[in-house]
């Protein structure tokens, strides 16, 4: 059973991962 809290944590983790990936990509392109 998946709770709303687990969904919230998963969404925040995905958002953080995407932000880190974008920042890493921008750094490499410089």
UniProtKB/Swiss-Prot annotation:
Topological category with respect to the lipid bilayer: Single-pass membrane protein
Gene Ontology CC terms: chloroplast thylakoid membrane; photosystem I
A GO BP entry: photosynthesis
TM region(s), chain numbering: 7-29
Family in the record: Belongs to the PsaM family.
Subcellular compartments: Plastid, Chloroplast thylakoid membrane
Pfam families in alphabetical order: PsaM
Protein name as catalogued: Photosystem I reaction center subunit XII
InterPro entries assigned to the protein according to its UniProt record, in alphabetical order: PSI_PsaM, PSI_PsaM_sf
Annotated keywords: Chloroplast, Membrane, Photosynthesis, Photosystem I, Plastid, Thylakoid, Transmembrane, Transmembrane helix
Keyword Chloroplast: yes
Signal sequence range: none
